[in-house]
């Protein structure tokens, strides 16, 4: 389900701006250079305008030399402003790109720390939208708008001060016009900000839907779902259009309103200033300088108004990004870790830095417990949502080297049990014990290093065949990779590929068959060499020959390990040490194949095709 965002309270705006400034503040020297150059550029523009006054006055009673020197000096001051503007632009680009790098890095790192339950409620397109749409809007604002808004603010403030210095009476009129402009900008900004927030949320939802439809094109076409998918897309696109129209409508009215007010302001000041000059209460130079200031005042206000629209869009994106980064990460209070061990002269285990292939659990007090693969469920209760239990009082025992199979219809709780072993989720009642240790006391990284998984939906990554197998053990040698491929019965098909183990795999393994992807998944688990395996059986979608290869690979992989199998075909679990039959989150039958058939219960009915097994 796509994530929905409502408009934030005003206090969130200050938090978001402060956090963005914090990222830029990591580069203090560059950030200081930006602030200094922006200030100098704005002051130079103000000073150049003020210097028009003596230049004009020099025409009345002054010398030609005074006039020329005044023009040259004024041009030099403006030149300094231009050079500073070029300088702060380059510095700002550097600061912005460094800050964006940090934001992307921190966002991605935080995503890796979030629990699976966070991803369960979001589609991939919406998650991707944080990195693309939201971060891109931040990039546009930091690269182009941030420094301009600061310069505009300094220039507006400085202009107002200079206007009061030149003539405070006329400046009262200007101040009233300024106030009217800012009141309108504030009103429009607040209204458009809510729409910008909604626009970013709708954009993420639309991206997610597009990704779903692109990935599922075969299903869409098989079921003639094209028209229905277009209708859904149109509805989501219309929601985005509505939010975008609302945001841009308010934003678009700001500049014309500001321009209109500035023209009225200029006309009033020009008339009144001219009257003052005719009466001798204001000299020509002051009037000329004053009118230029008034005219220039419109430029930073227009610029501020225009860039503030981009900033509002960026802040809406930044709020979404920082909301994700503020999500509570996956908790890990375990203190027991997995370490390499070797036997001492007295036969006792001791920790070593060498890769011995022998492992043990090291408790916080230093006690070493051999890694054996002994797994117990003791009266485990669990539910994905409060008040909706999925498992009820699950108790089972898998001795080292045993094969435990789970069978039952869809939704019975088979996959949920395996998710609790590796702590993708934590139990809500009872406990899961691994080698006599509560899994909640084991550091998750160590726990998952001791487990291997072969899932029904095989996920491969862009890279070579070898890289995908090495994903199970990042420091695996080429020899270990090839040995794992042989265990999985994948070596022969890999060597028939044009580049063998160096063949590139496209995203999600689209250039390989379903069976080949499953064989690589088995090889990936084999190279990790874990004592405990979780297998989500998936042989129904491949041909008979490939199915036989997969079964042989599975059998080799399971040798000498504790194995939990989610069975989809009862013919493959006959040799299991124990079969757990689940129904509505409870183990309703248990025993080996022959015992369960003799009971003539649910397993018997499933085996004889009286009920569907999935």
Map each language-model feature to its residues.
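Transmembrane helix-loop-helix hairpins at lipid-water interfaces of multipass membrane proteins
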Residues: 31-87, 164-169, 280-284
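Helix-loop-helix
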Residues: 61-63, 162-176, 246-319, 324-328, ...
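ABC-type nucleotide-binding domain
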Residues: 341-614
């Amino acid at each position: 389900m796509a994530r929905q965002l409502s408009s934030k309270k005003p206090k969130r705006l200050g938090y978001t701006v402060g956090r963005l400034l914090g990222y830029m503040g990591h580069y203090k020297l560059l950030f200081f250079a930006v602030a200094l150059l922006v200030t100098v550029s704005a002051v130079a523009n103000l000073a150049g305008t003020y210097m028009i006054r003596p230049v004009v006055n020099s025409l009345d009673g002054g010398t030609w030399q005074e006039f020329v020197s005044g023009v040259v000096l004024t041009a030099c001051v403006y030149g300094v402003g231009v050079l500073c503007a070029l300088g702060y632009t380059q510095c700002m680009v550097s600061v912005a790109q460094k800050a964006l790098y940090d934001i992307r890095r921190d966002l991605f790192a935080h995503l890796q720390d979030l629990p699976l339950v966070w991803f369960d409620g979001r589609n991939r397109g919406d998650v991707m939208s944080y990195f693309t749409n939201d971060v891109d809007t931040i990039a546009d604002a930091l690269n182009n708008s941030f420094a301009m808004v600061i310069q505009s603010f300094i220039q507006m403030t400085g202009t107002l001060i200079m206007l009061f210095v030149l003539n405070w009476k006329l400046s009262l009129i200007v101040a009233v016009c300024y106030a009217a402009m800012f009141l309108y900008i504030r009103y429009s900004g607040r209204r458009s900000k809510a729409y910008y927030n909604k626009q970013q949320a709708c954009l993420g939802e639309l991206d997610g839907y597009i990704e779903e439809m692109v990935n599922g094109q075969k299903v869409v076409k098989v079921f003639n779902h094209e028209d229905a998918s277009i209708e859904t897309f149109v509805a989501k696109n219309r929601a985005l259009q509505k939010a975008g129209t609302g945001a841009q409508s308010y934003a678009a009215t700001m500049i014309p309103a500001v321009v209109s007010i500035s023209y009225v302001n200029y006309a009033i000041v020009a008339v009144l200033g001219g009257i003052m000059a005719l009466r001798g209460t204001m000299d020509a130079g002051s009037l000329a300088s004053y009118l230029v200031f008034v005219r220039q005042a419109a430029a930073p206000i227009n610029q501020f108004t225009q860039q503030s629209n981009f900033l509002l869009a960026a802040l809406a994106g930044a709020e979404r990004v920082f909301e994700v980064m503020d999500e509570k990460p996956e908790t890990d209070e375990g203190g027991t870790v997995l370490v390499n061990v070797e036997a001492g002269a007295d036969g006792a285990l001791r920790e070593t830095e060498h890769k011995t292939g022998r492992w043990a659990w090291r408790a916080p007090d230093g006690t070493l417990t051999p890694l054996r693969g002994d797994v117990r469920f003791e009266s485990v209760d669990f539910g994905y949502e409060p008040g909706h239990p999925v498992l009820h009082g699950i108790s089972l025992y898998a001795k080292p080297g045993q094969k435990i199979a789970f069978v039952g219809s869809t939704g019975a709780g088979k996959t949920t049990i395996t998710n609790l072993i590796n702590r993708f989720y934590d139990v809500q009642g009872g406990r899961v014990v691994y080698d006599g240790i509560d899994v909640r006391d084991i550091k998750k990284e160590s726990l998952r290093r001791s487990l291997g998984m072969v899932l029904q939906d095989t996920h491969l990554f862009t890279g070579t065949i070898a890289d995908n197998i090495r994903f199970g053990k990042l420091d695996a040698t080429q020899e270990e990779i090839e040995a794992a491929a042989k265990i999985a019965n994948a070596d022969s098909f890999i060597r028939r590929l044009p580049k063998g183990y160096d063949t590139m795999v496209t995203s999600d393994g689209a250039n390989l068959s379903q069976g080949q992807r499953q064989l690589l998944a088995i090889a990936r688990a084999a190279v990790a060499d874990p004592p405990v395996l979780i297998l989500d059986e998936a042989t129904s979608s491949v041909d008979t020959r490939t199915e036989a290869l997969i079964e042989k690979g599975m059998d080799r992989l399971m040798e000498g390990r504790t194995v939990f199998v989610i069975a989809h075909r009862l013919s493959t679990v006959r040799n299991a040490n124990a079969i757990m039959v689940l129904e509505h989150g409870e183990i309703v039958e248990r025993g080996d194949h022959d015992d369960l058939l003799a009971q003539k219960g649910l397993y018997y009915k499933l085996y004889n095709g009286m009920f569907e097994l999935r």
